[in-house]
């Protein structure tokens, strides 16, 4: 590799997914070095309204946790806010939830995905917990993980989806595989007020055609 063709990433360096969170460079330059363009816009995401019927108990559970628990440790935030949402999703879609899913594409794209879901017909969703509750830098990490999924996958399907979350805030992202564009949604969804929309999108990604 010719070092002059890259803006910020060092061809001699090795980068794990979590390292992208700490890089001081712009997301535009990072994804350009990975071979993609970056965009930020309001996404028209797939939805699955049927999951509405399962909201009551989960809403009560999360509302209680938000009232009485102020987690400092990231593992606590995952266990009491993120995991219950994804467990409900996987039960509805009837698919396994993979946590700390190992993925290695090359020296720039390797590490563990916090949560990764893939259906039998290869619809995929990945979710990461934003370190330090920073959605902006968390999305840079998400972009790298979406790029890794794109490069690893040989199956059909034009779109890949992911989300970065603090537990109570969720932001979605999309990778267009044909255009090589990673798009960050401008909308941030809140739990519990917009839990229905979050679950509709998560289920829509896994149940509707890309």
Predicted region positions:
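A short, conserved, highly charged catalytic patch centered on acidic carboxylates
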Residues: 2-161, 169-210
């Amino acid at each position: 590799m010719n070092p002059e063709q890259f803006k910020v990433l060092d061809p001699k360096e090795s980068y794990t997914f979590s390292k992208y969170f700490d890089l001081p460079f712009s997301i535009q330059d990072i994804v350009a070095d990975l071979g993609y363009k970056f965009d930020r816009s309001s996404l028209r995401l797939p939805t699955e309204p049927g999951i509405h019927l399962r909201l009551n108990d989960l809403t009560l559970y999360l509302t209680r946790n938000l009232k009485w628990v102020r987690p400092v440790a990231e593992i606590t935030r995952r266990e009491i806010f993120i995991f219950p949402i994804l467990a409900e999703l996987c039960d509805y879609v009837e698919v396994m939830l993979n946590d700390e899913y190992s993925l290695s594409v090359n020296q720039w794209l390797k590490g563990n995905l916090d949560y990764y879901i893939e259906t039998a017909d290869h619809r995929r969703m990945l979710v990461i917990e934003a370190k330090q509750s920073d959605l902006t830098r968390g999305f840079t990490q998400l972009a790298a993980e979406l790029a890794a999924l794109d490069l690893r996958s040989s199956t059909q399907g034009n779109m890949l989806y992911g989300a970065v979350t603090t537990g109570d805030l969720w932001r979605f992202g999309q990778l267009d595989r044909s255009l090589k564009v990673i798009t960050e949604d401008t909308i941030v969804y809140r739990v519990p007020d917009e839990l229905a929309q979050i679950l509709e999108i998560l289920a829509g990604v896994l149940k509707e055609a890309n």
